[in-house]
Amino acid sequence: AQADAIQQVRDTLDRLVEVANEADLEAVAVTDHDRYHPALSAPVEQRNGVTIVRGIELRVDAGSQRLDLLWYGLEPTAALTAEVERIQQNRIDRGRQLIENVESYLGVDLHLEAREGLGRPHIARAVLESEADYDEFGAVFDDLIGDDGPCFVPRDVPDFETGRELLSEACAFVGLAHPLRYDDPEGALSCC
């Protein structure tokens, strides 16, 4: 199963390069939530005429809000790798608890296992595919697993300074993911 997943990731990366070439893009960045892309082994790679920049999207607690920081040109350090592993274990544990909460609350089996990379969108899709009386993705978040939902389980994320320190040693450039999503976009941008 893991070999199949790794092959699927490689196929997805190959498809990204095809699409970049079709769009006449010279470079693309590849990031994932709180983990490194497993098929990229260097901060910058060339594939079929496309420059691929490896990065990471790391959620941090900035006090007044949680921010998703994008870091590019990633060269993992031991400290960052340890933190990413801790975060991934927390995501698995959180996913398991979310699944249990939703199954108990709705009285259904989601036929979903907690695993690395599992997030609330996966759980929402499982609810839609279950016998539960839901047919809209957003309603699952609004009613069940959103930040104020009865099944919500918070994530354990590093504070801003810890994230900044870990990533400044491992990455060349920083950005803010989806800056207009935040309640205070200017405050979010001022952190970067």
Tell what function each PLM region has:
Residues 1-11, 90-192:
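Domain-core and long-helix interface of multi-subunit machines
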Residues 1-65, 144-146, 170-192:
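An N-terminally biased module of ancient metal coordination in phosphate/nucleic-acid-related enzymes
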Residues 2, 24, 28, 77-80, ...:
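Generic, low-specificity signal for short hydrophobic/alpha-helical stretches with a mild N-terminal bias
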Residues 46-47, 51-53, 66-101:
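Conserved, surface-exposed functional patches that form binding/active-site neighborhoods
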Residues 61-86, 129-149:
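Active-site gating loops and adjacent loop-to-helix segments of metal-dependent hydrolytic enzymes
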